[in-house]
């Protein structure tokens, strides 16, 4: 099984950008922790970050046939991108949305996610550990898919 982790705009600035909101952990450190969890679970993982909406849409589309699930932090595109929403819907892969901060506690324009309706769930406001929680959630989804496939073989 393979997880694609997609990081949206400005997440490459973690550790420097608004540490009072996002903390001091760098994106590379978050990815190292996720890689460790994936290694322990025997799961492949790939990381992608872009500040450009079209590149994120392209990466989501490339997941067809190459990934089994997506963990995405669409960052500011959460509130504006119908294109990312539609791409996730089109690929029909289990997707978990992650946010380091809690958008509901921030500006009004951050309170609505256009992405949430096409995801298996959201993990928000737990800081960088939210990515670990998303990994646990995705691994559980993989186990459920495996169990369903096994049960269907027995029919």
From Swiss-Prot:
Catalytic activity: 3-dehydroquinate = 3-dehydroshikimate + H2O
Catalytic activity, EC: 4.2.1.10
SUPFAM superfamilies: Type II 3-dehydroquinate dehydratase
Keywords: Amino-acid biosynthesis, Aromatic amino acid biosynthesis, Lyase
Pfam families with a match to the protein in the record: DHquinase_II
Active site residues according to the UniProt entry: 22, 99
A GO molecular-function descriptor: 3-dehydroquinate dehydratase activity
Metabolic or biological pathway, per its Swiss-Prot or TrEMBL entry: Metabolic intermediate biosynthesis; chorismate biosynthesis; chorismate from D-erythrose 4-phosphate and phosphoenolpyruvate: step 3/7
GO biological process, one term: aromatic amino acid family biosynthetic process
Marked site (Transition state stabilizer) residue numbers: 17
Keyword Amino-acid biosynthesis applies: yes
Record-listed substrate binding positions: 73, 79, 86, 100-101, 110
InterPro entries, per the entry: DHquinase_II (IPR001874), DHquinase_II_CS (IPR018509), DHquinase_II_sf (IPR036441)
Enzyme class name: lyase
Its biological purpose: Catalyzes a trans-dehydration via an enolate intermediate.
PANTHER family: CATABOLIC 3-DEHYDROQUINASE
UniProt-listed HAMAP family: AroQ
Similarity field: Belongs to the type-II 3-dehydroquinase family.
Subunit structure comment from the entry: Homododecamer.
Protein's name according to its UniProt entry: 3-dehydroquinate dehydratase
Species, as recorded: Campylobacter hominis (strain ATCC BAA-381 / DSM 21671 / CCUG 45161 / LMG 19568 / NCTC 13146 / CH001A)
GN (gene name): aroQ
């Amino acid at each position: 099984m393979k997880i694609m982790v997609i990081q949206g705009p400005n997440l490459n600035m973690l550790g420097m950008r608004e540490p009072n909101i996002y903390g001091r952990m760098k994106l590379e450190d978050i990815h190292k922790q996720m890689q460790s969890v994936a290694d322990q679970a025997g799961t492949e993982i790939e990381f992608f970050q872009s500040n450009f909406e079209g590149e994120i849409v392209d990466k989501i589309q490339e997941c067809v046939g190459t990934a089994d699930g997506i963990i995405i932090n669409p960052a500011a595109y959460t509130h504006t991108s119908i294109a990312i929403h539609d791409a996730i819907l089109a690929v029909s892969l289990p997707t978990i949305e992650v946010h380091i901060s809690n958008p509901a506690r921030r500006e009004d324009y951050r309170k609505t996610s256009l992405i949430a309706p096409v995801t298996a769930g959201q993990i928000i406001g737990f800081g960088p550990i939210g990515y670990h929680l998303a990994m646990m959630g995705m691994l559980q989804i993989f186990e459920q898919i495996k169990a369903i496939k096994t049960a269907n073989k027995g029919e």
